[in-house]
């Protein structure tokens, strides 16, 4: 049976987090630098553990004002220290509740810059490796972060997005520009199934781009996030595609 991991970015102040955790297999929990705090981290970790969901850290630039979506140009040692700090904080909370951190997925601008900026990607991966080399690195399919992780001997998962538009080079269409977000649930469902089954995605210019789909992101902060998550779980099930973190 074909299987896929479904992940969601959680602990960011949305009231659907607990319900979403019943539908996804991996949770990326905000570590306080773009959203959340120690209380939301503890609460979300507890929910995830009760649901048996794989827990990951969701570190970002220090940018609460802009939800971590503004590009920043920090030195590699600053990136290293910031990622290490955020991973360590969440890992301590997970351990205190009897669990273990499983993966790391950068957030927002940090994620996007790391997909194309090799020195930044290497700084992130060095921090992850030095903290715990068993952690899995989630990164944009085909991007520099995934390449850096594998180069340093870490396991990586190539991530695709159900509700985001793609450029012809495999990058995500920048937020705020036409085609960045897929508002139609049907279109997002079709895109997800195509990526999982056919390992390709149609870019906004109409070209088909090869893509490796190992984990699918369902954004937890969308207006219809919960309804869409239910639909995609149902659709995947009807297509004979299992959902599990180890996929």
From Swiss-Prot:
Q: Which UniProt keywords apply?
A: ATP-binding, Hydrolase, Nucleotide-binding
Pfam families given in the database record: LamB_YcsF
Q: Which domain of life is it from?
A: Bacteria
- InterPro entries (alphabetical): Glyco_hydro/deAcase_b/a-brl, LamB/YcsF/PxpA-like
Keyword ATP-binding in annotation: yes
Tell me if Glycosyltransferase is a UniProt keyword of this record. no
What Gene3D superfamilies does this protein map onto? Glycoside hydrolase/deacetylase (3.20.20.370)
User: What's an example GO BP annotation here?
Assistant: carbohydrate metabolic process
* Known EC number: 3.5.2.9
Q: Give one GO term, molecular function aspect.
A: 5-oxoprolinase (ATP-hydrolyzing) activity
Reaction(s) the record says it catalyses: 5-oxo-L-proline + ATP + 2 H2O = L-glutamate + ADP + phosphate + H(+)
Q: What is this protein for, i.e. what is its function?
A: Catalyzes the cleavage of 5-oxoproline to form L-glutamate coupled to the hydrolysis of ATP to ADP and inorganic phosphate.
PANTHER family named among the record's database cross-references:
5-OXOPROLINASE SUBUNIT A, UNCHARACTERIZED PROTEIN YBGL-RELATED
Q: Which family does it belong to?
A: Belongs to the LamB/PxpA family.
Full protein name:
5-oxoprolinase subunit A
Q: What is the lineage of its organism?
A: Bacteria, Pseudomonadati, Pseudomonadota, Betaproteobacteria, Burkholderiales
